[in-house]
UniProtKB/Swiss-Prot annotation:
It comes from Salmonella paratyphi A (strain AKU_12601). Probably involved in the control of the structural glucose backbone of osmoregulated periplasmic glucans (OPGs). It is found in: Periplasm. SUPFAM superfamilies: E set domains, Galactose mutarotase-like. The keyword Transferase does not apply. Its main location: periplasm. PANTHER family: GLUCANS BIOSYNTHESIS PROTEIN, GLUCANS BIOSYNTHESIS PROTEIN D. The lineage of its organism: Bacteria, Pseudomonadati, Pseudomonadota, Gammaproteobacteria, Enterobacterales. Residues 1-32 form the signal peptide. This is Glucans biosynthesis protein D. The gene is mdoD.
Amino acid sequence: MNRRRFIKGSMAMAAVCGSSGIASLFSQAAFAAESDIADGKIVRFDFAGLQSMAQALAKKPWGGAPGPLPDTLANLTPQAYNSIQYDAAHSLWNGVANRQLDIQFFHVGMGFRRRVRMFSVDTTTHLAREIHFRPELFKYNDAGVDTTQLEGQSDLGFAGFRVFKAPELARRDVVSFLGASYFRAVDDTYQYGLSARGLAIDTYTDGQEEFPDFTAFWFDTAKPGDTTFTVYALLDSASVTGAYKFVIHCEKTQVIMDVENHLYARKDIKQLGIAPMTSMFSCGNNERRVCDTIHPQIHDSDRLAMWRGNGEWICRPLNNPQKLQFNAYMDDNPKGFGLLQLDRDFSHYQDVMDWYNKRPSLWVEPRSKWGKGAVSLMEIPTTGETLDNVVCFWQPEKAIKAGDTLVFNYRLYWSAQPPVQSPLARVMATRTGMGGFPEGWAPGEHYPDKWARRFAIDFVGGDLKAAAPKSIEPVITLSSGEAKQVEILYVEPFDGYRIQFDWYPTSDSTAPVDMRMFLRCQGEAISETWLYQYFPPAPDKRRYVDDRIMR
């Protein structure tokens, strides 16, 4: 497994779509899509044909890493690359009257070496035509690109694409596909946050992680006035090929993507990740080890949420551990899962550059029976906010063998809140700190004599008021140590209850402590289940250092 940076240029990219490889699978015919930039040969296209293409490709050797780019593109700095802009006058659907959506393309360059092919599809005739690269589609501004090196290189392709929605048809994008199989979307804040991927392979194994690539896209021409469009994608890597269909709904307050993928394994795969997502968690209320900045919290997502196949709701706050952690939460036909950013209060972040309070949540809703497997979560240590250190995906229980065909259907919701939530009481926040003393009586003369770690979990909603306070019973399970000084406190400002306990070690072990808690009333669960992983300090660190200077 490699530590990853979001959309990093070193991701393995596979060359799959030679001109003959794609065009030979579709017959030529006439073309009438509303695009004035599509200039390639006219070919017939449909999703069934794309599936056949991916299946045939899986029987051939992988094409390997992409070739080098012209020097003027390969040596671009991030600042220079970002200064290259697509010319909105050449947008994909500029010929569609009353269009609500439009497409622009990303330039290849810097770390984006994959030459991705783009096609415009006429939805009436099912005819497609390629859009070839040419310098006049872009504004190079101060990038310092020597465009004479690019003349006649129509096979350069593009790095990716982004989607714009009226009334911001050329100013603020709402969907972006860029780098390997990464893609993102926004809610009504127009603030990007976490990312999704087409597929994850061997994320946490003893081998090298593999990053499949989307190597070609086909865009159904959007209808006038429509805020939904369909794009198809061909995925390729050393281990697998895939045919993807995305039906993308660009709604007022959220983006919803219906995803259908058909996967064809080239070789045995140790770990396959379905509906993977990548996020960042540096510090928060529960984890402040590296929070030595002016910002109280720094994260794209604050929790993993799961709606299990048996109906149980899970809240698992994210961590920034000192050592890489991988956890697999077993399930059978999950109802949904996602990485959520539910804390939307600016004062909790104080960030006017990255606006973490505006970042969207991402919820996965399976649209078919996924069977047995696990929601897998990997957390990587990070010192700041530039590393995407959280990865989550569904891992099927059944081993993937060469020649296998798999189909997964799911829906992605990019929104401030997930589309569903538990009817029970929900975890609002998790806080940790010094323990070993009665709440409200932290001693001022000296630190507590015995070391302990305090946990405070805030619950809101559900039937808490009907049960509270005497009938609320916290059910706490620990993999090691003891929970003492358990308290149930009503918190008027958020009209909920805080469950507080101190964790005391019973051994010198520094192994992670798995914690589990839910609230019960008269034998029935009245809250979702809180899961947490705590990392005890070494025995010689289990003391409080008094650094006061008394004169």
